[in-house]
Amino acid sequence: MEDREMSTKPESISSRPPEIPDNDWKISLYDPGDNDDCPRACFLPCDMFAHTRYRLDLIKQGRDPLDLTDYKDFNPTCWKFFGLCTGGFCIGSGIYTGRETTRIRQKYGIKGTAGDDMTRGIFCQPCSLIRNDLEIRQREGMKQEADLPPPRPLGEDYQPIFAIKPDGYKSEPRMTTPRGILKPIASPEISSPPDGQPALREVHFHEPGQGNAPNVAASYPAEGGHVSQSSFSPRTEGGPSTVNQRRSREGTLTPIEEADNQAGEERNKSTTLGPAMNTFQRTTSPPVMHVTTSDAPIQAPTPTRDHDRYGNGRGPDTDRLEVPVQSNTPARKSRFSEEFDAPSADEMFSKIPDAAPSSTLDAPPRLPQLPGAFDTPAMPPATVPAGSSDVPSQLPQLPGAFPSSSHSETPNMKPSALGQLTALRDVANQSPKVVTVEEAETSIAETIQDEADEAQVGDRPHDNSQDPQLDTLPPRDTRHRLNIDEQLAFLPPQAEAHDSGTNTVVPLPDQPEAHGPHMDAKVALAAARIKDHPIESDPRINSPKPISIRNHEFTEDKRLAVPRSDSPFKPGIHLDQRVPTPPALVRPHNRLEDRQTATPSPSADRENRNLAADVRTASPGLGSRRGGLMGGRPHSLRHDSRVGTPKHLENVHDLAADVRAPTGPVTPLAKSPEPRSPPPKRLAAASPALSASSISIGTRAHQLLEHFLEGNRKAAERENGNKS
């Protein structure tokens, strides 16, 4: 068992990538990450940790760790981390985060120690969680970019894997020419004729039908001169031969170079001796020999943009040699295609009669207006209206009427009228020839001219002096003065003011004085009197005199109520005789002198009441003049129905002797608030003369007295309650 553990341990250690010394974290510990990474790491660290663990599991399974499509929230890893956060006070989750950091560091060979990972996981747990997730995302993204195949170059033999063409699609021909068809044409050799012998002219051409045959040179005697020395020789650096050879090797031709070659050849083919054929033109017809038959003097070809681009050097050989040369070789026509022949500019204008023989090249062209549209060159020639001085002519063959032979497999159809008109104007502006148009187009031009010459309403300048509307308003002074105000001119001479007091109309004198309040028509007559308005004389004002007129004294004010309070009166307030002084504030109230108060209830100060002084509470005595307690007859408790003391035969209570007994109703179960010694017992012997009938009469009288006293007591209590 130990051998198996020892054998598996080196394998696990060797499977980990070694630590690279310079391999450090690509993400800083304090990198905030994306917008939601920082809040998730602080408030939902379990979710951030679960995402990182899920990415590591995808790497272990060989899947894309950046694809979280199958990730499920609230997985077991998330709940486990949540339990460590809440139960271990973040120490357990910090250790868990440190172990995850160590795992990531060992996987990518990042330098560091496990102790540092644990420390950062405990004390910087959100930062460690963000760095772990960002590190995996960045390293795996860089790895995927490095594993992509390199882009395939788009060469001549490249074919796309998928080529979807819609119905009716017609592909454009490729801008290439098969190798072997283009052959460089050598320039004529420079030769000097010997004395007395005619100059020989060498012409290099291709035989028709033998496109791949070598060049054949033919010598023809030159009459009346010798061949001009051309600057475009094979020995010239950057000349056409070098360019042609390079193009032959490449087999391509740009549209700009093709257009430049065509323009240069069209300008020089009538006066230039040499290879004027455009060998790079895509055509199915075999090339022909081109030799000029013009009587014009021989001159060197005019350098084109191709020459300026590839051979910028100009030497003394570029000077023109004006030597007439005659030749019987048929003229060559440049062929754009098999169906159409494009005439040159000289051929087009040679067919147009000169309407102005006296004009020169420097004179501006005289052309009528050319509105409307033109037809194709295949239409009948245009005619001039009857009576016109213009000579009938035929429309020239316009270059715009022919198709291009470089970008389309089919010839172009009928060109637009605007294109023909533009081309015709461009051609006409280069020559003093006159081109006419049809009658309908001439009438349109005349109509446009008439409309342009028609007088308009607003053509003449506007003169303010001729405007009759400006004479109605007289000139007025712009300055505003109150004494001559124009707005008051409509008022009658005698302005009137309305007096609201007398309700009469009083005329105001018209005085040439300064404008003031007393002259204003809107001010009442009362305002004209410059005097103070007394408040006393105004019967419409009922307000009292203001404080500024007289001083207000409280002693004279009979309407001020004196506030009543228990505090002593303030000085000055007692002068008001309408407020009586309450007697309660003058002397204290003695309850003993109040005859209306019956036996009061016990007060807080436990005031002792002398029952002997209260003659109304005494019981009438029997057999005595004065009766009651004053007569000296003892009071028996057994006769008192309101006293809750247990009736004992041997206990005779004497009220006269008990001067400290508390007053008030006593309940049968009431107890004395303070324990005190019982009064001395006095044994009173019954009178021998007292019979049973006398005792019953006395008891009845005592009950009646108690009944009356009870009514008085209740009435006194009601009065005391109302007063309080």
Curated annotation (Swiss-Prot):
<feature type="region of interest" description="Disordered">
    <location>
        <begin position="496"/>
        <end position="517"/>
    </location>
</feature>
<feature type="compositionally biased region" description="Basic and acidic residues">
    <location>
        <begin position="550"/>
        <end position="560"/>
    </location>
</feature>
<feature type="region of interest" description="Disordered">
    <location>
        <begin position="532"/>
        <end position="691"/>
    </location>
</feature>
<feature type="compositionally biased region" description="Polar residues">
    <location>
        <begin position="270"/>
        <end position="296"/>
    </location>
</feature>
<feature type="region of interest" description="Disordered">
    <location>
        <begin position="1"/>
        <end position="23"/>
    </location>
</feature>
<dbReference type="Pfam" id="PF04749">
    <property type="entry name" value="PLAC8"/>
</dbReference>
<protein>
    <recommendedName>
        <fullName>Uncharacterized protein NCU10291</fullName>
    </recommendedName>
</protein>
<dbReference type="InterPro" id="IPR006461">
    <property type="entry name" value="PLAC_motif_containing"/>
</dbReference>
<feature type="region of interest" description="Disordered">
    <location>
        <begin position="166"/>
        <end position="477"/>
    </location>
</feature>
<feature type="compositionally biased region" description="Polar residues">
    <location>
        <begin position="403"/>
        <end position="413"/>
    </location>
</feature>
<feature type="compositionally biased region" description="Polar residues">
    <location>
        <begin position="227"/>
        <end position="245"/>
    </location>
</feature>
<feature type="compositionally biased region" description="Basic and acidic residues">
    <location>
        <begin position="304"/>
        <end position="322"/>
    </location>
</feature>
<feature type="compositionally biased region" description="Basic and acidic residues">
    <location>
        <begin position="637"/>
        <end position="657"/>
    </location>
</feature>
<feature type="compositionally biased region" description="Low complexity">
    <location>
        <begin position="682"/>
        <end position="691"/>
    </location>
</feature>
